[in-house]
Amino acid sequence: MVPGDITTRTGGYIYDARVADGLRSLGWTIDVRTLDGSFPRPSPAALAHAMGVLAGITAGARVIVDSLALGAMPDVIAAHASRLRIAALMHLPLAADVSADPDTRADVAAAEGRALSAVSLVIVTGTATEALLSRYRLPAGRVVVVEPGTDPAPLARGSGAGPVALLCVAAVHRGKGHEALLQALSEVANRGWRLVCAGDLTRDPDMVGRVMTMRTRLGLQDRVSFLGDLSASDLNEHYDRAALIVSPSRQETYGMAVADALARGIPVVATATGAIPKLVGSEAGLVVPVDDTASLAGALSRAIGDADLRRLLAAGARRVRARLPTWDDAAARMAAALTSLGTS
């Protein structure tokens, strides 16, 4: 059960779609049920629709509910928990969203905790998510980690001569750190670089407006491009031309765009959130603290200004590339988790 369009090209939806496809390839029958797009702040009609969707599922069936919806409908989950084998698929707990105010997070945590206590299994997309769920004191045996995969990809060719091509792959919203990135880049304006930002521009219009205004105020409009959501083929072209991937995110539970970059042997400058420090290590990029613009600017200055360093980090990225999990691996782990749900 997924709120909105599962073909949406953001991390959580990509995960859901790829794992569903992988399970089908393993012989599982997968039926995606679409919930109203108003989640995680559902209207009464959206909750009624979700109740009806669950009511229409055969008793005893396995049901995976995406975290974007689960924590916002604890009463709906509780009403069907004894009849269905419900698994929560937790990307980012709603109560852990850093863009929400503390009072809102407290209310959301209470609702999310009730929903999680009712399900039979909790599937998390990384150990960072697992840590964020510690507040709910879930039994250890009920939580299973199924990390995202990557697709085998050719090594990126890079930007060649001229400005260093930077690529940031992230929807523009409060948690992704675009303001910090622009500020950091303004501090290394004397370096030769260009930045392409690929990611949805409709999710958080207020933040998009702030970022565009900031780009103009800093005089970066000729060096920073926001292309919006790209097709897979167009995004692959930008990966192929990138010399560095930049991920300034304030909060990730894994870091799929970083993993996709490493799958192409592209070095990374990123913030230390989610699985990014583990993915990148010390060999494939430079990792800086979250919300530390000075450190981000320093890392960018080093990576942009030192071609030998970029070559060294690219060699490290190629080594990491060889050991990244695939989407087939993710599907196999999900199948094992769901099989255990069926015999519990």
Question: Where do the protein language model's features map onto the residues?
Answer:
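Conserved donor-binding/catalytic core segment of Leloir-type glycosyltransferases
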Residues: 123, 157-176, 182-187, 196
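Short alpha-helical donor nucleotide-sugar binding micro-motif in glycosyltransferases
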Residues: 229-230, 237-242
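Carbohydrate-associated surface elements
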Residues: 128, 149
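Aromatic "clamp/platform" in nucleotide-sugar-dependent glycosyltransferases that forms part
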Residues: 250
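Glycosyltransferase donor-sugar binding loop
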Residues: 194-212, 228
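Membrane-proximal helix-turn-helix segments that form the acceptor-binding/catalytic region
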Residues: 103-122
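Conserved acidic donor-binding segment of nucleotide-sugar-dependent glycosyltransferases
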Residues: 282, 286-293, 302-308
